[in-house]
C-alpha cells in the first residue's frame, strides 16, 4: 500500500494517500461503520491530483469512479452494518437559469446496484441567507425574486443517506439505558432531564424518548451548522472558498446510532479529520484517509489537540483506535 504519510495511535489511524489504494490493504468485514462526505460530483475541485475524484471530466464519470469506492467500502464493512453518506444535490451552473442534478438520487441508485440496501434519508436544514453569502447563487437573490421569480430556487438541504450491507448484524447496537446525550440546538424540556441515564423500564425513559424523536425525524432542523472542526489553516492559496467540514452534530448522531463503543469507524474522505474526531470522542476507533497533504496535516493537528484538550478543538472550529487493520511499516 502506497501512502505519503501516516499516523497511528491507540485510538485512531490517519493516512495521507488515495483511499482506493489504502482500502486495498483493509481486510474484508473489518469496519463497523463508515460515515463521510464525498466530493459533490465536480461542483468543487479540491486538488489538481489526477487521483482526486473531484477532478472527473463529467458528472457520469464521477458516478462511475465513486462506485469503485462505494464497492470497496461494501467489501470491508461487516454484514448488517451501515454506511452513511453526506451529500447535496448540485446546480448545473450559476447563470440564474439553471437546473439541479439529482446527485442524492444517483448516489442511492449506485449503492443499490452494488448491493447496499437504502435505509433512510435525513435532510439537514440550511439558512438561505448563509447559503447565498457562501455561494452567491443568483437563484437565491432577493433581486432575482423581484425581477423574475420564475428563475428562483431554494437553499437545498444537505442529506445524510443511510445504507445497510446485506446480512445479519452479529453485534446488536444496544442502548440499555436509552440515549444519554442529545447533540443539537434545541433545549430538552426540564421535565425529562431527570430520566437521563434511566436504568429502569425504558418505556418510562422520557429523556431518551425525547432525544429519539429528534433523531428519528426525517428533517434535522436542529443541526448546529457552526459546530465544525478548524479548517482555515488547511487551505492552500489556490483553494476555492467553499471549504467547510461536515458538521459534528451529524457525525455524532451517526456514530451513536450505528456503532458500538470500541467499533471501527472509517472515512475515505477524511478532510480535516471530523469523522475520525467524532468517532474517537465517542469511544470508537477512527480510521481516515485523506489525499490532500494540507487537509491531512490539519486533521493530524485537530486529532492531536483533541486528545489533550477536546473542548479547545470545537471552540476553535466555531470561529467560521490504534487499528491493526493496516501495517504501520507498510508505507512504500
Where are these regions (language model features)?
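Class I S-adenosyl-L-methionine-dependent methyltransferase module
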Residues: 106-107, 300-332
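Core catalytic lobe of class I
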Residues: 1-298, 325, 330-332
